[in-house]
Amino acid sequence: MSSGGRGSAWRDRNVEHFVRSIVKAALSLLVLQAPSTRAQELDHIAVFLEFCTGTRIAEKIVLTAYHCLENRIPKSASGSGVKVKVTDHLISPLAREMKIDVRHDVALLYLEKSLPAEVPIVPLASRGQKFERYVRLGYGFHAGENGWIDSNALGKLKVDEVFFWDKRPSEKGKMRFAQPANRTCPGDSGGPTLGLDNGHWYVAGVTSRVLPDLRHRFSWIVPLIQGKELPDYARYCGEFYTAERVTENLDFLVKGVQTLIARHPEPLLRAAPPRKVTARRRK
């Protein structure tokens, strides 16, 4: 091979290596540097998943809770009035059921096609980011004033500002929020708890479980002793809810997006055939 040929091959390999490194870096930052979501877009952010809720974090990828996929994978995701088929999923390898909650309660769904542009791609919170306020979105059941589910209807969006249950919330582990006016109930699982930073929303948490306080946790003892029918606590929305902290799952979320994109490569666009140009006679 001539020196010119060797030089050309060397340049080609370097160009290929450079392109691959750029693509890899872009994929790694895809989730973290999604376009900011302005405050007025709240009504379009949450994605309905038949029996849970989710958030669009990449072009065809929806973030939800691991426990939403334990028994059955959602068949479709709906946003802005459009239903799209779910074709693949990934569960955090660290996810596991605990006594009263789920650890690393996150999973990803891959859609057959993109949701409408009205459903924004929401960026994930970054480590150390501080928020002015929090809002929880969910398509779950609705509860009455006493906290018990009073309707079996799912699919009606709830948008509520939420506040920490703890007076001094921890910087690590699950976030615990007091119940808002429209209580967090089953069906809200997997939905986002959004944090507001400088006029833009970020996914700070993923709704995990609704839990009762100690008083309600042991309230079944009295009716048990009295021989009365026990309350159906599966229909109770609890005093607070937990949200999986996004910043403790960034490694899985970034690599998970990369994996799903690699599994489903986009077909190359074919060049449109040249149109026939016909000459028109002037009148």
Annotated model-derived regions:
Residues 52-53, 190-192:
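Beta-propeller and closely related beta-sheet repeat lectin domains
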Residues 57-69, 154-156, 164, 194-283:
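C-terminal subregion of chymotrypsin/trypsin-like serine protease catalytic domains
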